[in-house]
Amino acid sequence: MYPIVPCPAPRMTRRDKWAGRPCVQRYFAFRDEIRLHGVTIPDRAWLVFVIPMPKSWSEKRRAEMDGKPHTVRPDADNLAKACGDAVFSEDSHIWDLRATKIWGQSGAIWVGELTGEIE
């Protein structure tokens, strides 16, 4: 488990390389943090993204939602894309990927390896 707050991959433009929008700057910081922690992703991966709950939520709601599925934006595939792009320059060798989003007290990313035979 890596203590990194997940961030989706933004839709990039050529201009974002020199005049960064806030979402792009957040993504670049996320990418740097992934590399700093030395995250590795296997060819068959299960990525679990723990999305931090808003501070504005009551303690009751926080306790109720802890560990429950995260069903609002950002999309799981966008989070997985951001992770893959941060780790690999070419990620076509990943052939089996599962992405899960859950609510948590603080943000984190868990990387596991899928096992078992394909029928």
What is each model feature region?
Residues 1-119:
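Catalytic phosphate/metal-binding cores of nucleic-acid and nucleotide-processing enzymes, i.e., regions
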